[in-house]
UniProtKB/Swiss-Prot annotation:
GO terms for biological process: isopentenyl diphosphate biosynthetic process, methylerythritol 4-phosphate pathway; terpenoid biosynthetic process. It comes from Synechocystis sp. (strain ATCC 27184 / PCC 6803 / Kazusa). This is 4-hydroxy-3-methylbut-2-en-1-yl diphosphate synthase (ferredoxin). InterPro entries: Dihydropteroate_synth-like_sf (IPR011005), IspG_bac (IPR016425), IspG_bac-typ (IPR004588), NO2/SO3_Rdtase_4Fe4S_sf (IPR045854). It comes from the Bacteria.
């Protein structure tokens, strides 16, 4: 009996690149958001803006660890005027830092003052023209809806013109928890209401020939946040809009869960090519947010700002204390930005799973490890010499820099 041989299956070409949504470039000081530029990392100081020295110190701390845009809150005219001193002192004692100011309730006059001193103004459509809730109201007629829309236009127009004429930018920052009453009655407490709220403000800006816009659709629940951003992208695509998106899960909390929650929302969208700037909002010191942002971007291959470590979870085959050795390797090499280094416990899966790494440290037999350059085994050395020999190999290749 002749057995027919099966044809060798053809392996499809898998594209592992994240193809980012095409967006227009929007300037924020010396930084550009969108337009194919790297995803920008930002945060917000928690100092009172009236405390000029404290605010300057807070902005500087964030900027020095990689925060590329820093936001401040401006709840009053006094806070707005303090921004002039903050900006001047930053330039005199440090350097210019791209600044964004948050403006909320009935903020037109404040926003006009703020626009003189910062690079971008963030407004919340649900609060910019504040509507006092009416417990007796059962809805809005078309006329009432339109009248409030006209009031919004009248209030927003001076700010738009000021930003347009200065070449500055605006973030239209919708929050699920602060939709206006008329949007809630008309569209419900839904992603659709969030999208319509943003589109109303975008169209006013476009009618005044102002398109330096960034849009955000934040929510404290990840599924709502994801739905809102995806619907916003769908609507913008239908309308021929290409505004960059600022991603974030608002009020994510603290600790491990706050980081996981933020990552679940932000990384899911980034993996789909959605998002041009990110903030991880934690109930912790703002400085704690920045490493999380860069870790998300590194994990997705969108920005490489640190060493990428590949390490197995350890099992009964592991030939050395994997956790301790990984710590030693990390401490010795963490400054070598751009390298991929693998630490694997045994040769069963080690060489295959670390094939994309620049260097590998693999358990070979009891008391010995093998060092790899890519897929090639270079040498076997005693485990006690492993970390130093790894350093020597990197140095021999000319890829070492002193910390």
């Amino acid at each position: 009996m002749v057995t027919a041989s099966l044809p060798t299956p053809v392996q499809p070409e898998f594209d592992t690149t994240i193809h980012r949504r095409k967006t227009r470039p929007v300037p924020v000081g010396a930084v550009t958001v969108g337009g194919g530029h790297p995803v920008v990392v930002q945060s917000m100081i928690n100092e009172d803006t009236l405390d000029v020295d404290g605010s300057v110190a807070g902005i500087r701390r964030l900027h020095e660890i990689g925060c590329e845009i820093v936001r401040v809150t401006v709840p009053s005219m006094a806070h707005a005027k303090a921004l002039a001193d903050i900006k001047q002192k930053l330039q005199a004692t440090y350097q210019a830092v791209p600044l964004v100011a948050d403006v909320h309730h009935n903020g037109m006059k404040i926003a006009l003052e703020v626009a003189k001193h910062v690079d971008k103004v963030r407004i919340n459509p649900g609060l910019y023209v504040f509507e006092k809730p009416d417990a007796q109201r059962e809805g809005y007629s078309d006329q009432e809806f339109a009248e409030i829309g006209e009031k919004i236009r009248e209030t927003l127009e001076p700010l738009v013109i000021s930003l347009r004429d200065q070449g500055k930018s605006m973030r239209i920052g919708v929050n699920h928890g602060s939709l206006s009453e008329r949007m809630l009655f008309t569209y419900g407490d839904t992603p659709e209401g969030m999208v319509q709220s943003a589109l109303e403000f975008i169209k006013i800006c476009e009618s005044l020939d102002f398109r330096n816009l960034v849009v955000s659709m934040k929510a404290s629940r990840v599924p709502v946040m994801l739905a809102a951003y995806r619907l916003m992208v769908k609507r913008m695509d239908e309308l021929g809009m290409d505004y960059p998106l600022h991603l974030g899960v608002t009020e994510a909390g603290d600790g491990e869960y706050g980081r996981i929650k933020s990552t679940a929302g932000i990384a899911t969208l980034l993996a789909d090519g959605i998002g041009d700037t990110i903030r991880v909002s934690l109930t912790e010191a703002p400085e704690k947010e920045i490493p999380v942002c860069y870790s998300i971007l590194q994990a997705l291959g969108l920005r490489k700002t640190m060493v990428e470590y590949v390490a197995c979870p350890s099992c009964g085959r592991t030939l050395f204390n994997l956790e301790d050795v990984l710590h030693e390797v990390r401490e010795a090499t963490k400054h070598l930005t751009g390298l991929d280094i693998a630490v694997m416990g045994c040769i069963v899966n080690g060489p295959g799973e670390m094939a994309d790494a620049d260097y590998g440290y693999v358990g070979k037999q009891a008391g010995y490890i093998a060092l790899y350059r890519g897929r090639e085994e270079i040498k076997r050395v005693p485990e006690t010499d492993g970390v130093q020999e790894l350093i020597n190999l990197i140095k021999a290749d000319g890829r070492w820099v002193d910390p």
